[in-house]
Every structure is written in C-alpha cells, then in structure tokens.
C-alpha cells in the first residue's frame, strides 16, 4: 500500500481525494460488517477521514493500509 504521504497529498487532485477517502470508508465499513458491534458510530465518516489525516500528518512514512487497520482496531474498542 502507499504511504501516508500519498494520503496527505490526495487533496491536490479531486479524483485521487475521492478515491482514497472512498477506499478508507469502504475498508472501515467492511470491518464493521464483520464485527459484532457498530464501529462506525452511525456513519461519522468525517471523523474517520479526520483521524486518518492526523495519523498521516504525524507519521508520513506509515503505510495507509496499516494506518487503516489501526483505526479499525481503535474503533473496535
């Protein structure tokens, strides 16, 4: 998967921005379906995007997929 730098730079192109954000929301939604409790909290997708923005600004060399898994684990708590 790409690094968090690519996530942060996504805002430069509307198509890339939409693709990255749709992927993240779909990934978290997929984890949500496989679990026993609602991780998404009624669909607060802005909060999901904001979490990833903060994570990727803090650790730009992280892989997007790993950051998304970490988000999923945090939401599952």
Language-model region placement:
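Short N-proximal segments of mature Sec-exported proteins
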Residues: 1-54
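Surface-exposed, polar helix/loop patches in the mature regions of secreted/periplasmic/lumenal proteins
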Residues: 45-77
């Amino acid at each position: 998967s790409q690094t968090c730098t690519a996530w942060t730079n996504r805002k430069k192109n509307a198509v890339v921005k939409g693709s990255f954000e749709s992927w993240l929301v779909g990934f978290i939604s997929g984890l949500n379906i496989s679990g026993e409790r609602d991780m998404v909290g009624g669909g607060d997708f802005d909060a999901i995007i904001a979490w990833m923005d903060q994570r990727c600004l803090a650790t730009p060399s992280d892989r997007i997929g790993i950051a998304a898994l970490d988000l999923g684990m945090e939401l599952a708590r």
